[in-house]
Amino acid sequence: MKFLKTHLDDIVRCYCTSHMFIDEECYAFFASENPNSECYSYTGKEFKKKEVVWDKDRGGCMSIIPFKDREGEFLAVNEFYLKVSPSAAKLVRGKKTKDGWEVKDLFNLPYLHRFDIYHINDKDYVVCATIARDKSNKEDWSRPGQVYIGEIHSDLDNNNVVLTQIADGLYKNHGYTR
């Protein structure tokens, strides 16, 4: 197998990458962990077609996870900043439209760092992991993180995601694995 390295852009502190297929075309996503930072998608021949997924009104992106059964839709963590308290971290939904990308907030969850989407029995669920309940500063790990689960309804515009805590007491809960 041969890999070809391609320079697409200069993104300061690019922390998150992901991809999805829409109409059999691959879209690559790149987002920064910095505040007030854009997220871009790249597609087309040699990924030369660049689109703004969200503008500088967002940032702090930790993860972008596409839905398996909802073409052109994803969830992402926005506004995660370890040094900021209180935390403004939130989960957002992105959706490809004929005019570009539409991104809407779903819910705030302080110190939301990692999440995943599970598709079980024709329903989608989100599992969210926080690194802490609260922090007085970046090095404060005295209040543990939690894990939550909630159903993601097919009509997210008219249904809220209700989270249920399923684990607590997770100190320095930085990672996640399926």
Label for each model-derived stretch:
Residues 1-178:
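Beta-propeller-forming repeat regions
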